[in-house]
């Protein structure tokens, strides 16, 4: 019997880059569906705009670099970046903002560094932070869930708000936001941060009917949907367990300790874990294999740092949610984390 001689590695993974990206996009579907149910057609419009912008931007830059455009676009990495930006922004954001964020993410945060696998920062978070820093008011202008709002927007009305700034009846994005009980709607984290600064107790705020039914309940379902997608990624062995577990564990521990010491100022862990972009960040952002740590111990450190920074920024910073800033700050530390978390080589 003859045996073939081949060089290592002898074990090969059947998962290509494109298949990993497409499976990750599939895992995003529950979260996207939850957002569509709660916020309406705007989510799909933003998704379409982001995808179109990502593909065009990537194709133009690849052509300028004399790369084969069709082959590079097939890896679906641009689609994933676009999807992450689309689910992170308010559904009725003006069209040019999502175009700006996506183009910046693809051209500056990804291709300028050399393309897929070369970027030190998560492109989707770079694009998101660009909008958050440049246009903070529109980026915090979230709609109330459709189940409680007085204005259910059709696809045509949604398109009118996104592309023209107002509905056929003349209602602007801000006016649509204030149709629920005559008060402006906010994400749970934004609501708690604003009202606690006015002297209201967090314990009282989280038990109010408005917070439970209108604000937190919807975001809880969104986070649970992204959690379901994250579990799918675990089952498919596409992401390591260390990074999300470390992030969520650190955030839960910090919020539990803070709530125990000062319940009037800090919300319970359940609020922290199921509000904002917590689950999206834990399973789809910080698990990016390019911009996160590559060692087992390093992933624990990286995730713990992100979780700790999220808690600090949420409660002591100027923004209600700190996932994007935390991820980008920790991206800077990845080379240092990897250097000091390498396992000792046998024999040395």
From Swiss-Prot:
It comes from the Bacteria. Its EC number is 7.-.-.-. One of its GO terms (cellular component) is plasma membrane. It is an enzyme of class 7 (translocase). Keywords: Cell inner membrane, Cell membrane, Electron transport, Flavoprotein, FMN, Membrane, Phosphoprotein, Translocase, Transmembrane, Transmembrane helix, Transport. It is found in: Cell inner membrane. Its main location: membrane. GO terms for biological process: electron transport chain; transmembrane transport. The modification FMN phosphoryl threonine is found at residue 187. It holds the Pfam family NQR2_RnfD_RnfE. The chain crosses the membrane at residues 20-39, 67-87, 124-144, 221-241, 244-264, 266-286, 300-320. It is a multi-pass membrane protein. Part of a membrane-bound complex that couples electron transfer with translocation of ions across the membrane. Belongs to the NqrB/RnfD family. HAMAP family: RsxD_RnfD. This is Ion-translocating oxidoreductase complex subunit D. It comes from Tolumonas auensis (strain DSM 9187 / NBRC 110442 / TA 4).
């Amino acid at each position: 019997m003859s045996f073939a001689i081949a060089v290592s590695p002898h074990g090969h993974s059947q998962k290509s880059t494109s298949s990993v990206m497409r499976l990750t996009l599939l895992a995003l579907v529950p979260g996207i569906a939850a957002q569509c149910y709660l916020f309406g057609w705007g989510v799909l419009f933003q998704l379409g705009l982001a995808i179109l912008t990502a593909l065009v931007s990537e194709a133009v830059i690849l052509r300028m670099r004399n790369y084969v455009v069709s082959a590079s676009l097939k890896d679906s990495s641009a689609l994933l970046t676009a999807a992450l930006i689309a689910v992170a922004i308010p559904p009725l954001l003006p069209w040019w903002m999502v175009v700006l964020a996506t183009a910046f993410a693809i051209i500056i945060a990804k291709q300028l560094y050399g393309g897929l696998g070369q970027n030190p920062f998560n492109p989707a978070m770079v694009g998101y932070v660009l909008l958050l820093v440049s246009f903070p008011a529109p980026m915090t202008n979230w709609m109330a869930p459709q189940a409680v709002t007085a204005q259910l927007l059709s696809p045509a009305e949604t398109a009118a708000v996104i592309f023209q700034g107002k509905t056929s009846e003349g209602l602007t994005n801000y006016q649509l936001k204030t149709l629920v009980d005559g008060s402006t709607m906010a994400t749970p984290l934004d609501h708690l941060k604003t009202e606690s600064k006015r002297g209201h107790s967090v314990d009282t705020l989280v038990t109010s009917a408005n917070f439970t039914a209108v604000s937190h309940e919807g975001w809880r379902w969104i986070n649970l949907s992204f959690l379901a997608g994250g579990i799918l990624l675990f089952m498919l062995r596409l992401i390591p367990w260390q990074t999300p577990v470390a992030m969520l564990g650190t955030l839960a521990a910090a919020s539990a300790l803070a709530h125990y010491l000062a319940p009037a100022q800090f919300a319970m862990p359940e609020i922290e874990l199921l509000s904002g972009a917590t689950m999206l960040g834990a399973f789809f952002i910080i698990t990016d294999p390019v911009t996160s740590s590559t060692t087992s111990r390093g992933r624990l450190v990286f995730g713990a740092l992100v979780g700790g920074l999220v808690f600090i920024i949420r409660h002591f910073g100027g923004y209600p949610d700190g996932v994007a800033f935390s991820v980008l700050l920790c991206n800077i530390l990845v080379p240092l984390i990897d250097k000091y978390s390498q396992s000792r080589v046998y024999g040395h």
